[in-house]
């Protein structure tokens, strides 16, 4: 649940409470987009993906990765993390990185402006890495399968994907082909 303060009209309350659906997420693969809910409650999307095993899902819908309409996909019961290029929360889903984690990372990590090519996607945003990490080495095998990219924009074949969350998305390292980075 998120609590947001704002300037309310006269005679109304100043707090809006929005309910987030735990586990509601969207994944983009090279050829499709899947919108689903994690079947196991209480698990964060990033944690489920890092287990590197098929993730059980329900209420799945699929469509092209270009952002066009989705249709029910009754046959989709699981998502393989290795097939996922980009994972992100659905519009009403929980963020992939908590505010506390992001704040801690911001203090102890080096910020880079990055452009990541993971065909057919091009992701631009901010990457927070440990001082010992080199952003150009992200194409090599690492301990983490997914990397959070903050303040992301996603292009698919040169066209901006409109329903990208503003806070962060997860990019699969095994799909990264090229990284261009500069310190902030």
Question: What is the predicted role of each segment?
Answer:
Residues 2-184:
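Conserved RNA-binding domains used in RNP assembly and mRNA/RNA metabolism
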């Amino acid at each position: 649940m998120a609590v947001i303060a704002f300037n309310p009209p006269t005679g109304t309350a100043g707090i809006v409470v929005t309910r987030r659906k735990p586990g509601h997420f969207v994944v983009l693969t090279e050829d499709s987009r899947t919108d689903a809910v994690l079947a196991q409650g209480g698990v964060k999307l990033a944690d489920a993906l890092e287990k590197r095993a098929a993730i059980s899902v329900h209420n799945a819908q699929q469509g092209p990765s270009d952002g066009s309409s989705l249709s029910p996909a009754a046959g989709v019961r699981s998502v393989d993390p290795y097939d996922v290029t980009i994972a992100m929360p659905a519009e009403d889903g929980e963020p992939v990185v908590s505010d506390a984690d992001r704040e801690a990372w911001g203090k102890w990590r080096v910020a880079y402006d990055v452009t990541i090519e993971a065909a057919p996607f091009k992701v631009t945003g901010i990457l927070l890495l440990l001082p010992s990490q080199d952003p150009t080495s992200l194409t090599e095998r690492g301990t983490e399968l997914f990397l959070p990219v903050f303040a992301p924009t996603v292009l698919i074949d040169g066209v901006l994907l409109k329903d990208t969350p503003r806070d962060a998305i997860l990019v699969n390292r095994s799909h990264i082909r090229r990284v261009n980075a500069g310190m902030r």
